[in-house]
From Swiss-Prot:
Organism from which the protein derives: Schizosaccharomyces pombe (strain 972 / ATCC 24843) (Fission yeast)
Protein name (Swiss-Prot/TrEMBL): UBA domain-containing protein 6
GO cellular component term, pick one: nucleus
Single GO molecular function: polyubiquitin modification-dependent protein binding
Listed InterPro entries: UBA, UBA-like_sf, Ucp6/RUP1
PROSITE patterns according to UniProt: UBA
């Protein structure tokens, strides 16, 4: 029992829940290394997967995904503790993105809505029976309350067709419900793929579309992202009418196969509705899927290529309104860090096991119990004790110590190099441009975001950040295996920028840290279409982050602490704190320059190429 407890504790130290640790150990013959690989390779979660069509019987992992999800009124939506903001943003758009939600996250309410919308002919042609084949028994899936609420919205043209956050309507009320659904789905695609504010991955959405298409009879599993999306749109929509001839839907459908890999995410200028994105919605949809809240490492295998979206500096014919370019393969970075961390735990396990054996031998031979000795001192004592009695074992212990020192130092070096690269992001080039810091992701469950300060003006106890018009928030997602009313999906609390800076500097993590910026092209044509909300958002941060990314890694105006270097810290075996990582702290004095290709350069793997 004691040995099993030790193995479970080892896996829990790797970020695995106790239930997952027990399950994986049972499946792998109680071998820790095999159990860890079974978990982190995704085999454990895969073995628990339930077919999509039976997901209606699963209780939702997020209790807040209930009937209140359908309420269009912001004041009626579920709110975070302290009335800081809204966790979920229900709106009339929800039915349009329901297929993605129920396939990716297996949310029953999303499936219910999708089934009902399907049968009502809002998403499909009513005379096309093939669309209804996978969903025959609607009444078996719909609750009476959700059905009545959805009926109410559909009878009133899906309530307000405004965007996700409850802003004023951007779509003409004269449109019929089917056209509204078309436009809102187009906007949903644009949001999911083209957020100005976050680095997005496409794996979830592509996988969702593939599975939906499979449910409709398409068994081609080797389609590319572009082919998959095009096939999905072809199945779900009739050709757009003249009013939407230049929308994302028609632009995408008209592309040839050779064009899709390069231009799949391009949009024609002035063709799409005015987007009014909210940072909370981005976080809800993209950074906190329910699966990542339940299992600390399960999200790793879902992370795909990361894209960055920018606004081109000209509005010439043929220039896309948005330009998305691949930046890094985030899954590779994370998995490499994961493997290194696993290796570290394996080394420490062997290391500590050896020390425990010699501690026991030391006690039996000398009668002295080593209770207040740390690892380094115990090693020294063991070596001195063995030097004359067993030189071979003494040499072996010394070799073990040196091997661990070397491997840990290498890990520190690699981790610091990665974090330093991500903390500087851009290099100084020619021609000035401006950008501002929007969010800091230290690890998947710890995110800092910057919002307008209006949400906390009534709270006199909150110290504002350096900018009185902005407020930083810590969004900490739960890492527990279950989510309940007492353990919400995330906690949001206001913080100062100095706290963000300090946490970024001192937090020990084996994840790549991400600094997320919004940039604006100072030489952009006045005809370039940029939503007003985005313009205002960019202008506010530019005042405080206009000197970022020029290679400067310290700022006396932000902190009076001595600047940290990016050199590798030594692993001190006598240091109770264990592994220490040196991370350069964040700067608000930020300046970067524009390259001749109208893009801020990313170092090496972070490089972004833009068409001129």
């Amino acid at each position: 029992m004691e040995d099993l407890d030790t193995k479970i504790k080892t896996l829990k130290n790797m970020g695995v829940s106790e239930s997952d640790a027990k399950d994986s150990l049972e499946r792998c013959g109680y071998d820790v290394e095999s159990a860890a690989e079974f978990i982190f390779s995704g085999q454990l979660e895969k073995s628990r997967l339930v077919p999509i069509m039976s997901s209606t019987s699963i209780a939702s992992s997020l209790p807040s995904y209930q009937d209140t999800f359908f309420l269009p009124s912001p004041r009626k939506r579920r709110r975070l503790p302290g009335r800081i903001g809204t966790v979920l943003k229900p709106s009339a758009l929800f039915p349009a993105i329901a297929p993605f939600l129920f396939v990716v996250f297996e949310i029953p309410v999303a499936l219910n809505t999708f089934v009902h919308a399907t049968c009502k002919g809002l998403l499909f042609a009513e005379d096309n029976a093939s669309f209804h084949r996978p969903f025959t028994d609607v009444s078996a899936h719909l609750s009476s309350s959700s059905l009545s609420k959805y009926n109410h919205h559909s009878n009133h043209r899906l309530a307000s067709p405004g965007w996700w956050y409850g802003e004023d309507s951007c779509i003409s009320q004269s449109l019929d419900p089917r056209s509204v659904m078309q436009v809102q789905t187009i906007r949903a695609f644009e949001f999911l793929f083209s957020s100005h504010r976050l680095y997005l991955d496409t794996v979830h959405i592509t996988a969702a579309l593939s599975q939906v298409l499979a449910g409709l009879g398409n068994t081609n599993t080797s389609m590319s992202d572009g082919d998959c999306i095009a096939a999905f749109l072809s199945s779900y929509f009739s050709p757009p009418n003249a009013e939407f001839d230049s929308t994302f839907c028609s632009t995408l459908s008209s592309l040839t196969n050779s064009e899709k890999p390069t231009y799949i995410f391009n949009f024609k200028p002035n063709s799409t509705p005015d987007l009014r994105l909210s940072i909370e919605s981005c976080l809800d949809l993209l950074l906190h899927p329910p699966s990542s809240a339940q299992k600390n490492w399960s999200w790793i295998k879902h992370v795909g290529k990361v894209f960055c979206c920018s606004l081109p500096g000209n509005n010439a014919s043929g220039t896309p309104r948005f330009l998305l370019t691949p930046k890094i393969d985030l899954s590779k970075c994370i998995i490499e860090n994961r493997d290194e961390m696993l290796r570290r735990y394996q080394l420490e396990t062997v290391y500590r096991k050896t020390l425990l054996e010699w501690e026991d031998l030391y006690k039996r031979l000398t009668g002295v119990t080593l209770t207040d000795k740390d690892i380094g001192e115990l090693l020294t004592d063991g070596q001195q004790f063995l030097e004359k009695r067993n030189p071979a074992l003494s040499s072996h212990l010394q070799l073990l110590k040196e091997t661990l020192q070397t491997k840990i130092s290498t890990l520190i070096s690699n981790t610091n190099a990665t974090q330093h690269k991500l903390s500087t992001l851009y290099r100084g080039m020619q021609n000035k441009c401006t950008r501002r810091l929007l969010a800091v992701i230290i690890e998947p469950s710890i995110i800092y975001i910057c919002l307008k300060n209006s949400a906390v003006q009534s709270n006199r106890n909150v110290s504002p950040s350096a900018n009185h018009n902005e407020q930083w928030y810590l969004v900490r997602f739960t890492t527990s295996a279950t989510i309940s009313q007492d353990s919400p999906p995330c906690i949001v609390e206001p913080v100062t920028f100095e706290e963000v800076d300090l946490e970024f500097e001192k937090h020990i993590s084996y994840h790549n840290r991400l600094l997320i910026y919004v940039d604006d092209d100072c030489e952009a044509s006045t005809r370039t279409v940029i939503p007003t909300s985005v313009k205002n958002f960019i202008a506010e941060d530019n005042e405080y982050f206009d000197d970022e990314l020029a290679g400067i890694i310290h700022s006396p105006t932000v902190s009076t602490r001595s600047s940290r270097s990016s050199d590798v810290s030594e692993y001190d075996l006598e240091d109770q704190g264990g592994l220490q990582l040196t991370v350069p702290h964040i700067n608000t004095d930020v300046q970067c320059h524009r390259s001749r290709n109208s893009a801020c350069e990313f170092p090496e793997s972070m490089h972004v190429e833009h068409s001129g």
